[in-house]
Amino acid sequence: MAPHSDFIGEIGLDFSRQGMSSKTIQERLFEEVLSTIRDRPRFITLHSRGAEGAVLECLRRHGIKAAVFHWFSGSIKVLEDVFAEGHFVSINPAMIASASGQRVVEKSPKDRILVESDGPFTKVQNQVCSPPKVALVYQYL
Protein backbone atom coordinates (compact mmCIF):
# COMPACT_ATOMS: atom_id res chain seq x y z
CA MET A 1 0.00 0.00 0.00
CA ALA A 2 2.80 2.49 0.87
CA PRO A 3 4.14 2.70 -2.70
CA HIS A 4 0.78 4.11 -3.83
CA SER A 5 0.06 6.47 -0.93
CA ASP A 6 0.77 10.21 -0.93
CA PHE A 7 0.66 10.32 2.88
CA ILE A 8 2.89 8.18 5.09
CA GLY A 9 2.84 8.36 8.87
CA GLU A 10 3.67 8.02 11.56
CA ILE A 11 6.89 6.15 10.84
CA GLY A 12 10.30 6.34 12.44
CA LEU A 13 12.42 5.15 15.33
CA ASP A 14 11.88 5.08 19.08
CA PHE A 15 15.11 4.78 21.06
CA SER A 16 13.49 5.58 24.40
CA ARG A 17 14.04 3.09 27.19
CA GLN A 18 10.90 1.21 26.16
CA GLY A 19 11.86 1.16 22.48
CA MET A 20 15.47 0.03 22.79
CA SER A 21 14.57 -3.66 23.02
CA SER A 22 13.37 -3.53 19.40
CA LYS A 23 16.00 -1.10 18.07
CA THR A 24 17.45 -3.45 15.44
CA ILE A 25 14.11 -4.41 13.94
CA GLN A 26 12.93 -0.77 14.04
CA GLU A 27 16.00 0.31 12.07
CA ARG A 28 15.57 -2.45 9.50
CA LEU A 29 11.87 -1.75 8.98
CA PHE A 30 12.33 2.03 8.85
CA GLU A 31 15.06 1.66 6.20
CA GLU A 32 12.78 -0.70 4.27
CA VAL A 33 9.87 1.74 4.32
CA LEU A 34 12.08 4.67 3.29
CA SER A 35 13.55 2.72 0.38
CA THR A 36 10.00 1.87 -0.75
CA ILE A 37 8.71 5.45 -0.69
CA ARG A 38 11.71 7.51 -1.83
CA ASP A 39 10.74 7.41 -5.51
CA ARG A 40 8.56 10.54 -5.32
CA PRO A 41 7.60 13.34 -2.92
CA ARG A 42 5.10 12.39 -0.22
CA PHE A 43 3.77 13.86 3.00
CA ILE A 44 5.64 11.95 5.71
CA THR A 45 5.25 12.30 9.48
CA LEU A 46 8.01 10.95 11.68
CA HIS A 47 8.35 9.53 15.16
CA SER A 48 11.89 10.12 16.42
CA ARG A 49 11.81 9.78 20.20
CA GLY A 50 15.39 9.56 21.42
CA ALA A 51 16.47 8.92 17.83
CA GLU A 52 16.26 12.32 16.15
CA GLY A 53 19.78 12.22 14.72
CA ALA A 54 19.39 8.63 13.53
CA VAL A 55 16.08 9.44 11.81
CA LEU A 56 17.61 12.48 10.11
CA GLU A 57 20.55 10.39 8.89
CA CYS A 58 18.16 7.81 7.42
CA LEU A 59 16.29 10.56 5.57
CA ARG A 60 19.59 11.86 4.17
CA ARG A 61 20.59 8.40 2.94
CA HIS A 62 17.31 8.02 1.10
CA GLY A 63 17.15 11.59 -0.23
CA ILE A 64 13.88 12.36 1.53
CA LYS A 65 13.08 16.05 2.00
CA ALA A 66 10.28 17.99 3.67
CA ALA A 67 9.19 15.40 6.24
CA VAL A 68 7.49 16.38 9.51
CA PHE A 69 9.18 15.53 12.81
CA HIS A 70 6.27 14.90 15.18
CA TRP A 71 6.83 16.27 18.73
CA PHE A 72 10.55 16.93 18.23
CA SER A 73 12.43 16.50 21.52
CA GLY A 74 16.04 16.25 20.39
CA SER A 75 18.94 18.65 20.74
CA ILE A 76 18.93 22.16 19.31
CA LYS A 77 21.87 21.18 17.06
CA VAL A 78 19.85 18.35 15.48
CA LEU A 79 16.84 20.68 15.25
CA GLU A 80 18.96 23.14 13.26
CA ASP A 81 20.04 20.27 11.00
CA VAL A 82 16.39 19.25 10.54
CA PHE A 83 15.59 22.72 9.21
CA ALA A 84 18.77 22.93 7.13
CA GLU A 85 17.64 19.73 5.38
CA GLY A 86 14.22 21.27 4.57
CA HIS A 87 12.10 19.42 7.12
CA PHE A 88 9.36 20.62 9.48
CA VAL A 89 8.37 20.08 13.13
CA SER A 90 4.92 19.72 14.63
CA ILE A 91 4.06 21.50 17.87
CA ASN A 92 1.29 20.44 20.25
CA PRO A 93 -0.18 21.96 23.45
CA ALA A 94 1.96 19.75 25.72
CA MET A 95 5.12 21.14 24.12
CA ILE A 96 4.26 24.75 24.88
CA ALA A 97 3.61 23.72 28.49
CA SER A 98 7.20 22.47 28.98
CA ALA A 99 10.52 24.32 29.03
CA SER A 100 12.10 21.92 26.54
CA GLY A 101 9.14 22.22 24.18
CA GLN A 102 9.25 26.00 24.43
CA ARG A 103 12.95 25.92 23.45
CA VAL A 104 12.05 23.92 20.34
CA VAL A 105 9.41 26.51 19.44
CA GLU A 106 11.81 29.41 20.05
CA LYS A 107 14.44 27.85 17.76
CA SER A 108 11.98 26.93 15.01
CA PRO A 109 11.31 29.19 12.02
CA LYS A 110 7.57 29.92 11.91
CA ASP A 111 7.35 28.71 8.32
CA ARG A 112 8.65 25.29 9.44
CA ILE A 113 6.03 24.68 12.17
CA LEU A 114 2.84 22.66 11.86
CA VAL A 115 0.43 22.44 14.78
CA GLU A 116 -1.20 19.29 16.13
CA SER A 117 -3.21 18.14 19.13
CA ASP A 118 -1.63 14.68 19.59
CA GLY A 119 -4.89 13.87 21.32
CA PRO A 120 -6.31 11.96 22.92
CA PHE A 121 -2.94 10.54 23.98
CA THR A 122 -1.59 13.70 25.59
CA LYS A 123 -2.85 15.79 28.49
CA VAL A 124 -2.03 19.30 29.65
CA GLN A 125 -3.20 20.38 33.10
CA ASN A 126 -5.20 17.13 33.35
CA GLN A 127 -7.15 17.93 30.18
CA VAL A 128 -6.98 15.81 27.04
CA CYS A 129 -5.37 17.62 24.11
CA SER A 130 -8.27 17.57 21.69
CA PRO A 131 -8.21 19.38 18.33
CA PRO A 132 -9.73 22.61 19.74
CA LYS A 133 -6.71 22.84 22.07
CA VAL A 134 -4.43 23.63 19.11
CA ALA A 135 -5.69 27.21 19.48
CA LEU A 136 -3.34 27.38 22.50
CA VAL A 137 -0.41 26.65 20.20
CA TYR A 138 -1.48 29.36 17.76
CA GLN A 139 -1.78 31.84 20.62
CA TYR A 140 1.69 30.90 21.86
CA LEU A 141 3.20 31.31 18.41
Regions found by a protein language model. Give the residues of each.
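Short, acidic/turn-prone active-site loops that include or flank metal/cofactor-
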Residues: 73, 93-97, 118-121
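Short acidic/histidine-rich active-site segments
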Residues: 111-127
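His/Asp/Glu-enriched short active-site or ligand-binding loop at hydrolase and phosphoryl-transfer sites
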Residues: 84-100
